[in-house]
Structures are given as structure tokens and as C-alpha cells.
Curated annotation (Swiss-Prot):
Enzyme class: transferase
Cysteine disulfide partners in this protein: none
Thermal behavior of activity: Heat stable and fully active up to 70 degrees Celsius.
One Gene Ontology term from the biological process aspect of the record: protoporphyrinogen IX biosynthetic process
Catalytic activity reported: 4 porphobilinogen + H2O = hydroxymethylbilane + 4 NH4(+)
Organism annotation: Arabidopsis thaliana (Mouse-ear cress)
Protein name in UniProt: Porphobilinogen deaminase, chloroplastic
């Protein structure tokens, strides 16, 4: 393991001071070895060993810590530079090495960090920035232009329409889709006193919180990576926050969790907990590599959920949740939700059918069309 990989779980611990009633333990927030990112209170002594290069196309190319290429890389992985994004890139790299002996040699796989629009604009809520692909566009452009060979994305960030000249032939096995409640003074949302502020940039989370707990307040401009948001919580900017349990597991930071919300309490985002890996349409070699890693059960579930999202034309301005899973009999169970941003109205639906691609896509679309019809014009403007 190189220094960059180990830094995710070792260096620079930040202690969250809990109140007497809290069930939250102290945590190790880790450090990031990345170029071109300003992450508060996070540093690494390995940074000095990296060099930053500016390409003619304007995107930042960066090595990760001391991950030096000993020869021309067979695969260049493009990723964002957050600790979670790097953890996902490392997971991809290790799975490729396990499957393909020719990729084991040092330098055979190189990681390129690319800064996205969502990384650059941190002062506004995502809903105010607008547009799609806030965390993927620049990485996809690097892929199309040949600067990288594969792009590792959090699937929940991937627009329903992929950029031209790209395909997404691989979903890694999905992590836990539920949301985690993080708080220094209470174990659950229900225990928070009236007027407490919950920090989340997600309209999906905001609408479901306010629907069930209208006495709480939500701070929308609560952005940044996991470490940054935990630091804001520690600093008293908010009393609690919700984070994807999948990300906390990948960062080995579940000790921060006060409780885990059930699917009835908080339906997840479409594709939450899933990693998607894209390549160029004409790159058969990379497509073959990625196909060898694909987890078909995850891919089918994501296809159902994204068909639902596409039907609703969902974006960061729309509170939408959806989750497809396989039951004990092997059937697909899909649950979908749309809400008004203020949480006063929530519409839900569900479907059950064969766990087969065509049937699951049809279920997702049908569920989306039902909720569109029930919502009516002006629903999302409330």
C-alpha cells in the first residue's frame, strides 16, 4: 500500500468533543494527499512529493502522494480529490489488480485527480448552483479528451444521460444505502429539541426531515467533504447532520454514527452507495477490464432507480428518492418518493416485479409517471 492509500485511515486525527448524553465516539478524520484542493485542517507531509501540472485544456493533473509511475501506466483513473473519492478510486484499483495480474506492477495504474465545478463552488447550496453533472463534468471531459482512461464516480452524482462518446459498463458492489444520523447531543432526529438546526445540502434529506419533524430547521448551505462537515458540526454551526452510511464505511468512520435511519425514516437518493466506472465508447480494452468488475445485481438496481429519476427529470433542485432491492424470493422491490422542497407534501409509490433489466426499467419509468401525474403542475414550486 502506498502512502496515499494509508493516509486515508491513519494521519491527522480530529477529536469530536461529545456532550454527556451523546453516543458519538471520537473519530479519526484522516488526511488527503491531493493537489489543487484546500481542505480545512487537513494536511499531509507527503504533499511536497507531488507535482502539479497544468494541461493545455486547463484541467489540473496531479499525482497522489508518492504514487510514482515506474513505467507508462496501463490505466489512468480519473477521480475527484476528496478522501471519499480517493477511497473509491483505490477500491477500483485494488479490484483491477486482483482480477488482472498485468496490473499488479507499481505504476501500471495511475490516479489523476480532477477538480470539478462542485468542488470549486462551496459557498452556495447545490440547488442554487443549478445544472447537472456538478461533480462529474470535468472528469468526463478528461475521459473524452483522452487524458484519463476510466472515470470513477459516485453513481448518485452521474446525470441520467451520459456524455456522448462514453459508456458506463461497471457498477461495483453496492454499499449500505441508508443515511446515518450524526449528533453530539442526541441519538435520533426525534430526540432533537424544537428549533434545532440540522445541516444538509440535500433537498431530499431536507424535505423528508421537515415532513416528519416540522419543528426542526435545516441549514442548506452545509457543504464540503465528510471531514469538513464534521468539523462544522463540532464548531456548533449546526446541532446535527445526516451523512451517507456508505461513505462513512468506506472511510472507516462509522464511530461517528449516533444512529442509522431506517428506509421508512429516510428513503435514499437514487444510486446512493453505488460506484460507477465509465470509459470511452471506442475503448474496448478498458470496457473489458471494467466488465470484469461489474456487479450485475447492483447494475440492475441502479438501472431501475435511474429510469425513475429520468422520468421525473430529476436534478439538485428536486427532492427525489428511490431504492430498488431484491427480496427473499428474488423479486425486485422498488420504492420511490417525490416531495415539495419544504416537506409539506410527500408522494410515495412502490412496485414489485421480476429482477430482470427490462422489467426493472419499466417499473422505474412507470413509478415515475405515476408520481408525475399525482403531483400535477407546480408541485415542486411549493
Amino acid at each position: 500500500m502506498d502512502i496515499a492509500s494509508s493516509s486515508l485511515s491513519q494521519a491527522h486525527k480530529v477529536v469530536l468533543t461529545r456532550q454527556p448524553s451523546s453516543r458519538v465516539n471520537t473519530c479519526s478524520l484522516g488526511s488527503v494527499s491531493a493537489i489543487g484542493f484546500s481542505l480545512p485542517q487537513i494536511s499531509s507531509p507527503a504533499l511536497g512529493k507531488c507535482r502539479r501540472k497544468q494541461s493545455s485544456s486547463g484541467f489540473v493533473k496531479a499525482c497522489v502522494a508518492v504514487e510514482q509511475k515506474t513505467r507508462t501506466a496501463i490505466i489512468r483513473i480519473g477521480t475527484r480529490g476528496s478522501p471519499l473519492a480517493l477511497a473509491q478510486a483505490y477500491e477500483t484499483r485494488e479490484k483491477l489488480k486482483k482480477k488482472h495480474p498485468e496490473l499488479v506492477e507499481d505504476g501500471a495504474i495511475h490516479i489523476e485527480i480532477i477538480k470539478t465545478t462542485g468542488d470549486k463552488i462551496l459557498s452556495q447550496p447545490l440547488a442554487d448552483i443549478g445544472g447537472k453533472g456538478l461533480f462529474t463534468k470535468e472528469i468526463d471531459e478528461a475521459l473524452i479528451n483522452g487524458h484519463i482512461d476510466i472515470a470513477v464516480h459516485s453513481m448518485k452524482d452521474v446525470p441520467t444521460y451520459l456524455p456522448e462518446k462514453t459508456i458506463l459498463p461497471c457498477n461495483l458492489p453496492r454499499e449500505d444505502v441508508r443515511d446515518a444520523f450524526i449528533c453530539l447531543t442526541a441519538a435520533t432526529l426525534a430526540e432533537l429539541p424544537a428549533g434545532s438546526v440540522v445541516g444538509t445540502a440535500s433537498l431530499r434529506r431536507k424535505s423528508q426531515i421537515l415532513h416528519k419533524y416540522p419543528a426542526l430547521h435545516v441549514e442548506e448551505n452545509f457543504r464540503g467533504n465528510v471531514q469538513t462537515r464534521l468539523s462544522k458540526l463540532q464548531g456548533g454551526k449546526v446541532q446535527a447532520t445526516l451523512l451517507a452510511l456508505a461513505g462513512l464505511k468506506r472511510l472507516s468512520m462509522t464511530e461517528n454514527v449516533a444512529s442509522i435511519l431506517s428506509l421508512d425514516e429516510m428513503l435514499p437518493a437514487v444510486a446512493q452507495g453505488a460506484i460507477g466506472i465509465a470509459c470511452r465508447t471506442d475503448d474496448d480494452k478498458m470496457a473489458t477490464y471494467l466488465a470484469s468488475l461489474n456487479h450485475e445485481e447492483t447494475r440492475l438496481a441502479i438501472s431501475c432507480e435511474r429510469a425513475f429519476l429520468e422520468t421525473l427529470d430529476g436534478s439538485c433542485r428536486t427532492p427525489i428518492a428511490g431504492y430498488a432491492s431484491k427480496d427473499e424470493e428474488g423479486n425486485c422491490i422498488f420504492r420511490g418518493l417525490v416531495a415539495s422542497p419544504d416537506g409539506t407534501k410527500v408522494l410515495e409509490t412502490s412496485r414489485k416485479g421480476p429482477y430482470v433489466y427490462e422489467d426493472m426499467v419499466k417499473m422505474g419509468k412507470d413509478a415515475g409517471q405515476e408520481l408525475l401525474s399525482r403531483a400535477g403542475p407546480g408541485f415542486f414550486g411549493n
